[in-house]
């Protein structure tokens, strides 16, 4: 699909690229915001957007710093999830969107959604949290998976090797072999991420300030409903996301003691299940959006 990208200059003087896709027959359609993974510019959602608009939802997408046509800060180490959430708030103001029907976030886009909901309550209706870690590697006491990829990109002067490494984390070799055209499409989109963009977004993921666990309950207080989605093959994320789900549910329960927060495991899917398990993913989200 052809994607006409708009550019907004933020108060920080950075540029955020974005696309708002309307429903032609429904000028006041509820808006679904799609928020991306690291190294996954907004065009990775191209197959999902027509499905959502056919269901009567306008769709807003944006690129994180250094992804697509979004620019980076002068200090690459300065990016945090708080800052990215503020960027999205500016974007919503610019597009005159006072409330989004749903925020669907994958990986760091899901983390941004939780931070946004905690910081700006009652703007997100439904929050869909997909395939996210709950805190930085430092906070988790594990190895820093991001630093080697940054060093690889800097050493080679290209995102080629790093993009391939990430592709192989996202998708199984069997899936890539069976879907060469889609693998090629995704890889080409990934390569529109600059090395600076990759490093500055990794800074948010590596930051000592990145910890969703104390924010989950507050995020739940500021939304109307939530759904958690994780790919079956995405490492140990199902376990970590259950903890986040419980926190969000505690917040939602303050408004409705009988509230339920769904937790869907997408079979045979990896980190970006809207790509490698498209049919299952859109079935799950459209059912939730209609509720």
Model-predicted regions and their roles:
Residues 195-256:
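Conserved serine/cysteine hydrolase catalytic core
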Residues 114-156:
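Flexible "cap/lid" loop of the alpha/beta hydrolase fold
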Residues 29, 37-40, 107:
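Active-site glycine-rich loops that stabilize anionic/oxyanionic intermediates
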Residues 236, 263-283:
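Catalytic histidine-centered segment of alpha/beta-hydrolase-like enzymes
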Residues 37-49:
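The serine-hydrolase catalytic nucleophile loop
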Residues 138-144, 156-220:
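Conserved alpha/beta-hydrolase catalytic His-Asp/Glu region
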Residues 1-33, 54-57, 259-262, 290-291:
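Alpha/beta-hydrolase fold catalytic core
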Residues 13-14, 46-50, 54, 58-104, ...:
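Active-site loop/oxyanion-hole signature of alpha/beta-hydrolase fold enzymes
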């Amino acid at each position: 699909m052809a994607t006409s990208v708009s550019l907004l200059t933020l108060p920080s003087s950075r540029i955020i690229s974005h696309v708002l896709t309307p429903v032609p027959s429904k000028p006041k359609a509820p808006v679904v915001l799609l928020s991306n993974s690291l190294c996954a510019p907004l065009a990775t959602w191209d197959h999902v957007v027509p499905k959502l608009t056919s269901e009567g939802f306008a769709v807003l997408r944006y690129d994180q710093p250094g992804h697509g046509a979004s620019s980076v800060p002068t200090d690459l180490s300065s990016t945090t999830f708080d800052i990215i959430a503020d960027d999205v708030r500016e974007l919503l103001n610019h597009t005159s969107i006072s409330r989004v029907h749903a925020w669907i976030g994958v990986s760091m886009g899901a983390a941004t959604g939780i931070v946004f909901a905690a910081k700006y309550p009652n703007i997100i209706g439904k929050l869909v949290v997909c395939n996210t870690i709950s805190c930085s590697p430092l906070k988790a006491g594990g190895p820093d998976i991001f630093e080697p990829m940054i060093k690889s990109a800097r050493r080679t002067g290209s995102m080629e090797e790093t993009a391939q490494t990430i592709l192989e984390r996202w998708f199984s070799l069997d899936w890539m072999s069976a879907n060469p055209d889609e693998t090629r499409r995704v890889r080409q989109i990934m390569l529109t991420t600059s090395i600076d963009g990759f490093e500055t977004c990794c800074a948010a993921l590596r930051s000592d300030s990145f910890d969703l666990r104390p924010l989950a309950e507050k995020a739940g207080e500021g939304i109307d409903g939530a759904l958690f989605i994780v790919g079956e093959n995405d490492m140990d994320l199902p376990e970590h996301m259950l903890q986040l789900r419980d926190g969000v549910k505690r917040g939602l329960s303050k408004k409705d003691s009988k509230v339920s927060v769904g937790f869907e495991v997408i079979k045979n899917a990896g980190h970006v299940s809207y790509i490698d398990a498209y049919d299952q993913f859109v079935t799950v989200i459209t059912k939730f959006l209609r509720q």
